[in-house]
Amino acid sequence: MMKINRLFTVIVLTGIIFGQYNPDNHVVTTSMYYMNSVEDGSWTEFFELAEEEFTKMNRADKYLVSLLVLGHRHSGSLNEVVQIAEWKSIADADKSTVGLADMRKKAWPNEEKRKAFNKKYGRYWESKHTDLAVRELVTSRVKRNNKSTTENTVVSVVEWYLKPMSEVEGGTVKEREALFDEFHKKVIMRNDKILSRREMRHYWTGSLGGGTTPYVIVTEFANIVDADAVGINSETIQKSWPDEEKRKAFFAKRNKYIDREHNLGHRDIALHTNWVKLAKR
């Protein structure tokens, strides 16, 4: 399960960071884990063990709100596995980490069986991990996939860029957030091809102030065809704004906040296979 760098605990305890910018938002950590090549192992055995691991530990961890476990597709190396974990606060994330040992005891109350499982499952993993990011999840614009499924899905990770407010003529944070909320409600929530979506902004990762501000969108699709579809929102947009003039006016207003000059507005970070049986939704 996810381990958070102990530095996070130090920061919380010393009071350097007191919380998210918006107390209604959540904290999301992104970490990378590395698989071992097991001579007498198999993918079948690995996934059987992993399903037991995550099913039991996700259930035991009351602080963990959601978890995506993302395998290789078109990003990185075959042995790299990314976990995107959500908590209500960084304090909850720390409690989750501190309590892992007790959770494992509850999940496998028989000590011998627990040790045997840990040994068998643990050989598939290297002992190291890399903490990639700690971000603020905009909870007012989250779309969750609550449907029961055993079929793996596809997850894209894309970084977008906001203009400094000083460069947006007549712009305000209130207006920007209202426009983003409207797009989420009318497009993202109505588009069945977008299974889930998370918008994450600066917390301890990325830039803030002095220029363009990046934010990250994590989107889940049923298949690679939908993930690759450039105009996946076109039909929903047409239905939500049937009047062409009103449609143009809305996007002209919204898009003035997006920095199109920086990497043409976005940068594709990753495309993963989402191992749905390991997720906590």
Each PLM stretch: what is its role?
Residues G19-W108, E112-W241, K248-R281:
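Short S/T/G/P-rich N-terminal loop/turn motif that feeds into the first structured element of a domain
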Residues I4-I16:
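Sec-dependent N-terminal signal peptides
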